[in-house]
Amino acid sequence: MAVERIIFIRPGETDWNKLERWQGWVAVPLNEHGRQQSEALARFMRSIGMTALYTSDLKRALQTAEILSRFGTFELIPDERLRERNIGLWQGLTLDEMRKWYADEYAAMLKDADTYRIPGGESREDVRVRMKAAFADVLAQAKGETVGILTHTTALKVLMEDLFPGYNPLAVNLGNTSVTTMRRSGDSWKLVAVDDCLHLEGLRTSAVTELEAKQHDPRDR
């Protein structure tokens, strides 16, 4: 059976999310609020018939996936290609600190947002290549109509840019445990929900702007 619906999920909240510190590949665990978010999402998703959940192997993602698995019978499949962008020397910093302490490097990134490779880290193009490969493998290997992909903000946005021409990552927020859903439409895909957080029922969620944003978006607070 071909995959007809894919549900993308962002991990639950960590303390670094609250502090607006960029995590990259750092093994930051969920905080208590992030666990509550994940449990709320698990209750929401337990009846949707998901057969497999492909997940980033970063700690915050795996912890979110493990909570979801308590409420479902799907197969849990870690994949390092679904990790967030590795931001090298900038990991653990706020956006303001990056701009202040690495002003030249940050300016260079703004001039070449797709191919600039952060010192010790990745470019957006690096992330796009591995995300496209992971996505292709999901479609080739998955069994069942509905599968999930638990990944991170930048990783998901670069994939969306590839799948949906005209997609603007700076115009889209993705909150913690948000759900973004797409359905197959002939030979292509159609977005049917973006940043859906209705399952949180009053629980706080937060989003981060893109590294390339020229200033903070107040919606990200």
Feature map (PLM): residue ranges:
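Loop-to-helix element that buttresses phosphate recognition and phosphoryl-transfer chemistry
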Residues: I7-L68, I118-K132
